[in-house]
């Protein structure tokens, strides 16, 4: 036999309680599982679905706008209604409060001075004794499920969903990404009710509960659900933080020219065997990007540079990284493809240059033009290109160094004479003389498209060559 559930109408029609309806009569069939008094300014935080708020008016705001919002918040929290004590502390009720309660069919009741709130509470408790017993049994089962919260949080989420008949998911506030969630519930209606709650131990995460209409999770259980999920999440978040820290340390080692141990534990067994690219993003996006990469367990390395935050991504992770950054609305510059990790600094510099010159029109800017990385797969090949193109101009003699820096400045300033002269602090005549000397030494002319392309390749390969020379 179906258990009869206490409603607001039952309380109003009980003459011994002396209650009458002020507004929201359309909601008299709302269920009442508990009645609780609260005089705090935000009672919607402390009471939950199917609970009746009892107050002498201390928590009721005075202005019309605030009273309307008062009703809105109570209704959105799922309360059964509000019972106002006929007391001097009750402020005058406004038309806006009545209208909002009627519009939402949210019962606003008035109790006479002779009715203590304890009488209402005992009436509700007696009528819902069986329901409360079921809640205690559910609580016992909930803590049985919590025994593997640390070892298998996904299994725990699925079992909690089955126990509560509600969808559960934890998402990251900063990125909006789901950290852990139960499997999709069958036959979940489109009119599902969703509520979010902060977790006790992690201010950056929220629990979202998706409930069937009329089957909301009670506030009695909710407190314990939050505690159990918080325990499971703390272990998971620690693992994510450790992964992020290892990723940063490994990338720093690669930048220093060392091959870090355990690289496969993050990049996977294939690692960078098919090539890798660097992605540069703004430093202010670093925390969000690093957190998102860890939550998604992407096989990438991520860490800061001097002017950008970098991601080293194997070729096979490119689409995943691009989709992630697009979802975060983060702008990125992407290098060409490299094979040798000893070229990591050159690849990162290339990505940083692309990012700084990429503008703001697109979120993802790829390397365009002649991909130097196709020719310089290693420092050895970079050295070959530099020596072949520059010849004696690659030497360390001070006069040669001045000429080489002049050539590189000319290329960096897109062959603009005035800008190059200004950057070097010399006259145009001096610049002309130096370019003539460069032609004499290298046998290459900046007026020739072929020679200019060769100079540009040598310019791009120089960082790897100079690191090798050092």
UniProtKB/Swiss-Prot annotation:
GO terms for molecular function: DNA binding; DNA-binding transcription factor activity. It holds the Pfam family PucR. Disruption phenotype: Cells lacking this gene do not produce the MabO protein in the presence of nicotine, in contrast to the wild-type. Transcription of the nepAB genes and of the mao-ORF55-nbr operon is abolished in the mutant strain. Pathway: Alkaloid degradation; nicotine degradation [regulation]. Keywords: Activator, DNA-binding, Plasmid, Transcription, Transcription regulation. The keyword Nucleotide-binding does not apply. Transcriptional regulator involved in the activation of the purU-mabO-folD-nepA-nepB and mao-ORF55-nbr operons implicated in the nicotine catabolic pathway. The sequence GTTT-14 bp-AAAC seems to be the core binding site of the regulator upstream of the -35 promoter region of the operon. NCBIfam families: TransActPmfR. Forms oligomers in solution, probably homotetramers. This is Transcriptional activator PmfR. It comes from Paenarthrobacter nicotinovorans. The gene is pmfR.
């Amino acid at each position: 036999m179906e258990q009869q559930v206490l409603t607001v109408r039952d309380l109003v029609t009980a003459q011994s309680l002396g209650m009458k309806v002020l507004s929201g009569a359309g909601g008299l069939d709302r269920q009442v599982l508990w009645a609780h008094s609260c005089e705090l300014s935000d009672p919607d935080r402390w009471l939950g679905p199917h609970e009746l708020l009892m107050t002498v008016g201390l928590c009721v705001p005075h202005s019309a706008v605030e009273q309307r919002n008062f009703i809105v918040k109570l209704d959105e929290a799922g309360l059964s209604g509000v019972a106002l004590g006929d007391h001097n502390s009750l402020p005058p009720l406004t038309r806006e409060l009545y209208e909002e309660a009627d519009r939402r069919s949210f019962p606003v009741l008035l109790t006479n001075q002779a009715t203590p709130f304890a009488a209402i509470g005992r009436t509700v408790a007696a009528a819902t004794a069986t329901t409360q017993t079921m809640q205690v049994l559910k609580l016992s089962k909930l803590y049985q499920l919590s025994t593997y919260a640390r070892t298998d949080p996904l299994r725990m989420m699925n079992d909690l969903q089955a126990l509560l008949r509600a969808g559960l998911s934890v998402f990251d506030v900063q990125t909006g990404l789901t950290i852990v969630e139960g499997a999709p519930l069958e036959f979940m209606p489109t009119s599902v009710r969703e509520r979010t709650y902060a977790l006790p131990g992690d201010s950056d995460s929220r629990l979202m509960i998706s409930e069937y209409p009329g089957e909301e999770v009670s506030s009695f259980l909710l407190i314990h659900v939050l505690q159990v999920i918080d325990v499971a999440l703390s272990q998971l978040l620690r693992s994510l933080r450790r992964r992020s820290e290892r990723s940063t340390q490994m990338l720093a080692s690669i930048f220093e020219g060392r091959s870090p141990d355990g690289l496969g534990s993050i990049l996977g067994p294939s690692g960078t065997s098919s090539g890798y690219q660097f992605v540069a993003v703004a430093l202010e996006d670093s925390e969000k990007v690093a957190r998102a990469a860890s939550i998604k367990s992407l096989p990438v390395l991520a860490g800061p540079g001097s002017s950008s935050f970098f991601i080293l991504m194997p070729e096979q992770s490119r689409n995943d990284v691009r989709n992630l950054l697009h979802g975060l609305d983060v702008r990125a510059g992407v290098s060409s493809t490299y094979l040798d990790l000893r070229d990591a600094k050159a690849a990162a510099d290339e990505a940083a240059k692309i990012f700084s010159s990429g503008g703001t029109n697109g979120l993802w800017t790829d390397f365009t033009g002649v991909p130097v990385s196709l020719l310089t797969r290693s420092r050895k090949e970079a050295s070959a290109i530099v020596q072949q193109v520059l010849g004696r101009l690659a030497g360390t003699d001070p006069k040669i160094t001045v000429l080489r820096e002049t050539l590189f400045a000319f290329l960096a300033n897109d062959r603009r004479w005035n800008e190059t002269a200004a950057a070097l602090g010399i006259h145009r005549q001096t610049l002309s003389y130096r370019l003539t000397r460069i032609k004499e030494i290298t046998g290459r002319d900046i007026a020739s498209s072929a020679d200019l392309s060769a100079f540009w390749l040598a310019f791009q390969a120089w960082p790897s060559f100079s690191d090798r020379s050092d």
